[in-house]
Amino acid sequence: MTKICAFFTAIVTWLTIVFCPAEAVEPVFGETKAHIQTEFNEGEFVMGKYDLVVSPSGDDNNDGSLSSPLKTIGRAKELMKANGENAAATVWFREGTYVIDDVIEFNASDRKNVTYRSYPGEKVEFSGAREISGFTETTVNGVKAYVTDVEINGNEDYFRSLFKDGKSLSRSIYPKEGMLKIADPAQGEAIAGSHAPDFFTHSLAFYAHKSDIPDFANPKDVEVKVMHFWCDEHLPVYSVDKTTGRIETTIASAMRLRVDDNYIFENVKEALSLPGEWYLDRSEEKLYYVPEEGDTPENTVLYAGVNEKILNVINGEGINFQGIDFINTGWDYVDGKHTGIPFPETHPLYKNIKYGTAHPQAAFEVPAAINVEASKEINFTDCRFENISYTALKFDKAATDCDVTSCMFNNIGANAIFIHGDFVVPASTQRINIRDCHISFYGRIFNNAIGILLTHAYDCELMNNEIHDGWYTGVSVGWNWGYSDNSTNKIKICDNLIYNIGNGWLSDMGGIYTLGIQPETVIAGNIIYNVGCDESAYGYGG
């Protein structure tokens, strides 16, 4: 069944609920109140028999005591394993920023029943960014800018995320206001997808209105971002012909390009003008930045998201994270496997392709900065996930009995939380609970992302969360079209506050979006408002 059929099925269900209310029955829950935030008590420091202390000023040759702390989590993990005990233990992190150059890996060899947490009252950050300074003043496009040399090493250290004072800075975009419109989608050169050709055709070229194309100094640094249907396309430029308006890209679109589809250009040197904007020149290996009020070349320190992932837990058990801030990661284009490369090698544009086409729905193939897979009892409490450029936290296939409690997710590039399993009945991913979390400004890079996305999982609770300011759906549960058996069931979606989503960019969304038959699933006590779909003639559903 196609997505449109599912959409109308959802509409019928909604109308039935609104206009054909069932006879009053005893509620599943006695009283529901949307999002009453639970305060978390971080407790006091008590050094246990098997505990260790880590500090940015420590030394991995130390014994890990309070007066002689270690320096890295890697060394703490080694000592925990060497201990050979399974009694409860804690690794206490003293205040500071821990730059994660290599992904922190946990597996079956790591000791169980260990909590990695912040020292009470201290701020602990695990960061995926490196510091950039040493700016000098210059002029770009008639405005004052700062410039510094950066080592890119080809593509190895190229970055697309930049942070300052805890916030994400914007790459230079064109135009500054509104959107551009596709003049001609060149559908004659497109390749039809596997089904529903009105939606799924793939393009490596389109024609812009010629007057909309700036004189790009470095066209191959530029990205075309198309917003249409329920998908935003990230299409790096391969070539531009201003005489005809033709633009070719290195990724094929996931969905059909149409006349008047909205798009913008990102990472445009000629558009660099507003305070806080930046542009990375690949050929010169220089970073340009338009200063904000109070900046000087000497005091400006920026942080480039060069590492995309921070933590990976596979076959782990009994590992807890408490009071840790995961921050400032980078991103790259998704090399899609779901759609892959739809163009045959004989196609004249095949030579352009550098990445496979990603799944068009819900930022499904975007990786996670923190990943948990085939693991049990991996818990996050009172943690902060901020300025994460990919999906922040993913519980992947065969993750079970995991809790995320009283955590904050802010300025997330894709999905804030993604719970995913194999399409088997019963689902292998089970009992993942998200409670008392605050999710804000998700989908900042991959706009079709979800606040909480759940696909193919069983017996999970999504309860008492506040979710707002995303470009797409707040909570999505299902991932199975039609009326066949569904591995997603027994899900509680209760007492969530969901608002200010959509914001007029994409279509086919909802505060809560469900698919397929889901026995024992309960949706109750949620408050949803300010849901807005694409405002153009193409917009619907939201």
PLM segments and residue spans:
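Sec-dependent signal peptide recognition
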Residues: 2-10
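Extracellular beta-strand solenoid repeats
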Residues: 92, 99, 105, 117, ...
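Right-handed parallel beta-helix
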Residues: 317-328, 356, 376-390, 399-414, ...
